[in-house]
């Protein structure tokens, strides 16, 4: 990617943090905004995108992640020994907010930086942390998530993919589905059953799977958007080395639940900032913004502000994760529907609008369906009776 070398050099000279003194959030906000602005001017920053990474932004996103690492701005709250900045989760929230304000992507690979990386930081051995964390930040390893199965999506504990211990390795067999970008990933975070005699939530282990191992077949799934973001993955007698195990054998459920909390609870002010900017753009472009449509637009923004306030008050509370996931999914769906409504027939002439509209129903399914999130909220937060299962 072409860039202004003088501006790029100034990024390192003036804007890197002195990590001997952890800056206050406001100091860090100023530093982050300055760094991002310089990166935008030098064409090193990748423009923000929604749930889908468009093909034309793949290389810019790859470059932006590497650039942030080289300039010392990757992994805001990761330990310095693994290439991070050694700051706090609150500083990481500020980074996301400033990226949203500048309409810049905060990172490339959610599965790697948010899901796999955080899991390895929490549960990994020193060897696993050394092997995976820095290369992931440096964008040398892309990750995918291998959780859902044809018969175990919402009921994840019903998974059947097996990993049988065999000497110094595990023999992996089974199938996963709806794995984002598995066709590009070098590694995947995998849940597999290691003890079929134990109850559903037990007997499951968590693995860091090398996607280049023999016996792995990845088949991209054609979506109605025309893209193939999701894949189904088949495992036939795949020999995984024993050091692929993350955490203890048969104790993977707890590791996985923490990962899902990371995935579902990542919303906050940054998402609301991005939402507000997109709604503002909608209003500017619309030629039919009557009272009814204005009410719909402000209603979406107000719901976003409510989510932001909730996250600010209860941030870090794992019980908030399903609430955040549900609200984000519904906001994304409502936004896509409204954008199409405001543009009318012209919406079909704009590829981004059409793609978002076609993708929007999936927002209520991916990462845990809205129905499942409502069940979790009802049972775990509100204390309502458990929903009967079909077998009961």
Regions found by a protein language model. Give the residues of each.
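Amphipathic, small/basic residue-rich leader segments at the start of a protein or domain
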Residues: 4, 9-110, 131-135, 290-298, ...
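Glycine-rich phosphate/pyrophosphate-binding beta-alpha loops
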Residues: 152, 177-183, 224-225, 362-369
């Amino acid at each position: 990617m072409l860039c202004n070398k003088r501006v790029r050099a100034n990024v390192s000279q003036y804007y890197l943090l002195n990590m001997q003194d952890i800056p206050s959030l406001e100091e860090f906000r100023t530093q982050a905004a300055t760094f991002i602005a310089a990166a935008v001017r030098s064409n090193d920053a990748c423009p923000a995108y929604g749930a889908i990474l468009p093909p034309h932004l793949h290389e810019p996103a790859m470059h932006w992640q590497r650039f942030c690492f080289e300039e010392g701005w990757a992994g805001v709250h990761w330990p310095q020994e693994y290439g991070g900045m050694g700051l706090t989760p609150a500083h990481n929230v500020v980074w996301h907010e400033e990226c949203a304000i500048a309409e810049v992507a905060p990172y490339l690979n959610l599965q790697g930086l948010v899901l796999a990386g955080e899991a390895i930081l929490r549960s990994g051995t020193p060897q696993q942390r050394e092997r995976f964390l820095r290369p992931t930040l440096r964008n040398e390893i892309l990750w995918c998530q291998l959780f859902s199965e044809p018969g175990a999506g919402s009921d994840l504990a019903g998974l059947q993919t097996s990993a049988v211990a065999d000497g110094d390795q595990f023999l992996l067999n089974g199938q996963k589905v709806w794995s984002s970008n598995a066709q590009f990933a070098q590694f995947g975070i995998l849940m597999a059953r290691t003890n079929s005699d134990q109850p559903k939530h037990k007997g499951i282990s968590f693995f860091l799977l090398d996607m280049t191992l023999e016996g792995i077949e990845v088949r991209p799934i054609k979506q109605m958007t025309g893209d193939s973001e999701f894949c189904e993955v088949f495992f036939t007698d795949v020999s995984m080395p024993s050091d692929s195990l993350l955490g203890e054998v048969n104790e993977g459920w707890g590791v996985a639940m923490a990962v899902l909390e990371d995935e579902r609870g990542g919303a906050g002010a940054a998402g609301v900032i991005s939402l507000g900017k997109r709604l503002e753009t909608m209003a500017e472009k619309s030629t039919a913004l009557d009272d009814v449509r204005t009410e719909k637009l402000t209603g979406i923004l107000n719901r976003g502000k409510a989510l932001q306030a909730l996250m600010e008050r209860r941030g870090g509370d794992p019980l908030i994760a399903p609430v955040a996931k549900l609200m984000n999914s519904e906001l994304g769906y409502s936004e896509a529907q409204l954008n199409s409504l405001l543009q009318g027939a012209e919406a079909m002439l704009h590829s981004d609008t059409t793609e978002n509209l076609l993708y929007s129903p999936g927002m209520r399914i991916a990462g845990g369906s809205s129905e499942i999130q409502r069940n979790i909220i009802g049972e775990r937060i509100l204390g309502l009776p458990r929903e009967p299962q079909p077998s009961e």
